[in-house]
Amino acid sequence: MVLAMLGALHPRAGLSLFLHLILAVALLRSQPLRSQRSVPEAFSAPLELSQPLSGLVDDYGILPKHPRPRGPRPLLSRAQQRKRDGPDLAEYYYDAHL
C-alpha cells in the first residue's frame, strides 16, 4: 500500500524503494555466510620459518653473484663512448684542463 502511494506521487520512487529493500535483505542474509567461509586454523600458514635460512640461497637453490667492489672507473676512450653519454663538454673549452 505504501508502494502504491509512493507510486502515485512519483513513479520511480516506488521502484527505487522496492529495489533498496531487496538489496538490504540480500545484504543482511549474506552476512552469516562470510563467517562460515573463513579459513580454519589448521590451514593457516606458520608465522615463522621452520628452518633457518642457510646462507644466501634463493628459492631455486642458487647463490646470487655479488659484484666485485670496483674502484673509480677508467675514462672511456672516444671509441667506447655511447650516444647516451652525450658529448664531453670539456673538449669545447680551451681552459678546462688548467
Curated annotation (Swiss-Prot):
GO terms for biological process: fusion of sperm to egg plasma membrane involved in single fertilization; gene expression; maintenance of protein localization in endoplasmic reticulum; protein N-linked glycosylation; protein stabilization; protein ubiquitination; protein-containing complex assembly; sperm-egg recognition. Residues 60-87 are annotated as: Disordered. Key regulator for male fertility expressed transiently in round spermatids where it recruits IZUMO1 at the endoplasmic reticulum (ER) membrane and coordinates the oolemmal binding multimeric complex (IZUMO1 complex) assembly. Upon complete assembly of the IZUMO1 complex, its ER retention is released, facilitating IZUMO1 complex export to the acrosome. Through the interaction with SPPL2C, inhibits its intramembrane protease activity directly accessing the catalytic center of an I-CLiP. It comes from the Eukaryota. The chain crosses the membrane at residues 13-29. One of its GO terms (molecular function) is protein-macromolecule adaptor activity. Keywords: Endoplasmic reticulum, Membrane, Transmembrane, Transmembrane helix. It comes from Homo sapiens. GO terms for cellular component: endoplasmic reticulum membrane. It is a single-pass type II membrane protein. This is Protein Frey 1. Its main location: endoplasmic reticulum. Disulfide bonds: none annotated. Interacts with SPPL2C (via active sites); the interaction stabilizes FREY1 protein and inhibits SPPL2C proteolytic activity. Interacts with IZUMO1; the interaction retains IZUMO1 at the endoplasmic reticulum membrane and coordinates IZUMO1 complex assembly. It is found in: Endoplasmic reticulum membrane. InterPro entries: Frey (IPR031748).
